[in-house]
Each structure stands twice: as structure tokens, then as C-alpha cells.
Amino acid sequence: MSTLKRPTLREPTIIKVVPTVESISLTWMIGARCNYDCMYCPVELHDMTSSHPNLEKLKNVWKSFYQKTHKQNLPYKISFTGGEVTANKSFLPLIKYLQNGNFNISQIFVTTNGSASLRYYQQLAQLVSGISFSTHSEFIKEQEFFTKVSAINQLMIRPERSCHVNVMNEFWNRARIELYTKWLAEQNISYSVNEINYIDQIRTYPILQGTYNLG
């Protein structure tokens, strides 16, 4: 009697990844200037001394990029990072300039440490597709931070827009991280716990402590 052999199942192989909608994707670090000095953040990505680029300089950077790419006739997807973008007084005017111009911009995403005012984020939420807040326990004011997150989450309704929290997995703050994730889950707010690469850290330990008053 012959026996039938089961076919060997092969692991699926990714051949090609394509976007669901073609676009020109730009990650724009508008400057290294930051109002926080996190111990694990490399000097290339933050400092507290460099000058903020003004609105005209930022406009010129965009115009240069746009002139080189617009003939592709594709929408633009822009992700802003820093430094801390909201620390630059020209950032909100830049977003308004981009949205009010005839630039075929489909999406704008912003990463922030949450240190700007609630009113600022309420204005920003009307102009962008998504805001990602990041927790940094050396500087965080927990209750204020999560109050802002909750308010913005109510404004940015999925799937058209999104609010997200990057919980930084700081080794000294694990107990608070459990509190953060529990609170975010209860509020039905999108979050992820982000691992940290300490290779380029500027200090070997945290020297500051934020205000721990959540819960």
C-alpha cells in the first residue's frame, strides 16, 4: 500500500512591498534644537543651542524639494521630526503654508514630545493627518501630558486621522510604563512600547525626573 506524503509547507517569501497608494514620501527633520535633553538621544538628533530655521528658510527647503519632484504628479506624504518641532515658532505657520498651497499634499504626520500647549495641539490637529506623542520620563509632566493626549485623540478620529503615543521603554521607568499602557488601553488610545538604542547615549543614567502624578 502506498502512502500519501503531505506536501512540505514553505515559509512565505516577501517578493515585493508596494504602497496601497503611490506617493512621494518625505521625512523632514526641521532642526536638531530640542527643549528636552534625554540621556539616550544622540547629539546628532538633539541639542539645546542651535538656532531654529525661520519660516523663509523652511519654505525655501520645501520649494527646492518640490521643484525637483512635482513632475512625478504624485501626492506628498510628509513626516516631521526633530529635535522638537513644536519648539520652533515657525513650525505651525509652515504647516499652514503647506496646506494652503497648491502642493498636492495628501498626508502630514508629526512626532512631538508633548511639551506644547493643548491649544497648540488643537490647532495642529486641524491641519495634519496624525500626531505621535512620545513619553520621556526625565521631563514628562504625566497628568498634563496624558490630558493633552486624551483631548487630541478625541479630535483625531480614525481612520481619517490618528493620534498615537510612543511609550519609550526606559529601563529605569518600567513601573510607570505599565501604568501608561494600562491607562492608554483603558482610554482606547493607540500606543506602542518603543525599544531604545543606548549606543549613542549622552549619559549612562538619567539625571532628571519629571512629574509623576498619573493615577
Predicted features and spans:
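Glycine-rich phosphate-binding "P-loop"
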Residues: 47-53, 78-79, 83, 135
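Canonical Radical SAM [4Fe-4S] cluster-binding loop centered on the CxxxCxxC motif
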Residues: 17-60
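Conserved N-terminal glycine/acidic-rich loop preference
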Residues: 12-22, 39-40, 74-76, 126-129
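Catalytic nucleophile-elbow at a beta strand-turn-alpha helix junction centered on a G-D-S/GDSL motif
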Residues: 32, 83-86
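Radical SAM/AdoMet-radical enzyme domain recognition
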Residues: 59-80, 88-179
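A C-terminal junction/extension of Radical SAM enzymes
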Residues: 177-215
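N-terminal [4Fe-4S]-dependent radical SAM core
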Residues: 1-27
